[in-house]
Swiss-Prot record:
Role description: Catalyzes the reduction of 1-pyrroline-5-carboxylate (PCA) to L-proline.
Reaction catalysed by this enzyme: L-proline + NADP(+) = (S)-1-pyrroline-5-carboxylate + NADPH + 2 H(+); L-proline + NAD(+) = (S)-1-pyrroline-5-carboxylate + NADH + 2 H(+)
PANTHER family recorded: PYRROLINE-5-CARBOXYLATE REDUCTASE, PYRROLINE-5-CARBOXYLATE REDUCTASE 3
Species in which this protein is naturally found: Staphylococcus aureus (strain COL)
Listed name of the protein: Pyrroline-5-carboxylate reductase
Record's GO cellular component terms: cytoplasm
């Protein structure tokens, strides 16, 4: 299986590093390319033991899966450049935010299968939650192979393309939303009189430990919460205060704003 990666930004690097480290693919069958920084590309390719090239004919020849990881505003120029070299065997996997499958096919001037994936930055540690949507001309074997590739850097949720907006909001942007919540927790903890460094380190370990509890337990998060909440205790006192605020509405507004922006970005013709 030959894989080609167009674009070598942070997300693309996290993805193909995960694939290289977690699959049985031969490094000689993996090709990287970027827009222009050959020195950085060469160094990264040599570090991973894979190939790099700027020759589109070489890259696309016999390529099974072609990852489109360029910045969205660079895609039209990339499509113009590579479309003369596309073969019938190329399946495209886009990690570009906001660019619909139909637009990708239109710019590439082909009817090759196209999948869109929406990972998050946790791909860097092999724990992305990645939404994926397929064009209707994928065969089952190719779908399975792509799912296996994506699972190399986390878990997969297959949805319709329209629902990628919701996945973008919930899991794509999710790490940033959680970081923001944790930031506020640190600020509040510091106001109790502890040193900021102590609070930050404590909360980092609190997050790690709580995540492991969720990972290793078959219980719901609600049940895990109940298990550590004693009637009349300190935890109950804090939760009673939290329940005075409509946290659900706050998060609904947050997620809806992200969904709306994702939809706006996908309206290519309006830009």
């Amino acid at each position: 299986m030959k894989l080609v990666f167009y674009g070598a930004g942070n997300m693309a690097q996290a993805i193909f590093t995960g694939i290289i480290n977690s699959s049985n693919l031969d490094a000689n069958d993996i090709y990287l390319t970027n827009k222009s920084n050959e020195q950085a590309l060469k160094a990264f390719a040599e570090k991973l033991g894979v190939n790099y090239s700027y020759d589109d004919a070489t890259l696309l020849k016999d390529a099974d899966y072609v990852f489109l990881g360029t910045k969205p505003h660079d895609f039209d120029a990339l499509a113009t450049r590579i479309k003369p070299h596309i073969t019938k065997d190329n399946c495209f996997i886009s990690i570009m935010a906001g660019i619909p499958i139909d637009y990708i096919k239109q710019q590439l001037e082909c009817q090759n299968p196209v999948a869109r994936i929406m990972p998050n930055t946790n791909a860097q540690v092999g724990h992305s939650v990645t939404g994926i949507s397929f064009s209707n001309n994928f065969d089952p074997k190719s779908k399975d192979e792509i799912n296996d590739l994506v699972k190399a850097f986390g878990s997969v949720i297959e949805v319709s393309e329209d629902h990628l907006h919701q996945v973008t909001a919930i899991t794509g942007s999710g790490p940033a939303f959680l970081y923001h919540v944790f930031e506020q927790y640190v600020k509040a903890g510091t106001k109790l009189g502890l040193e900021k460094e102590q609070v930050e380190e404590s909360i980092r370990n609190l997050i790690i430990g709580t995540s492991k509890m969720i990972e290793r337990s078959d219980l719901s998060m609600a049940q895990l919460r109940k298990n550590i909440t004693s009637k009349g205790g300190t935890t109950q006192a804090g939760l009673d205060t939290l329940s005075q605020y409509d946290l659900v509405s706050i998060f609904e507004d947050c997620l809806n704003a992200a969904v709306d922006r994702s939809i706006e970005l996908s309206n290519i013709e309006d830009q």
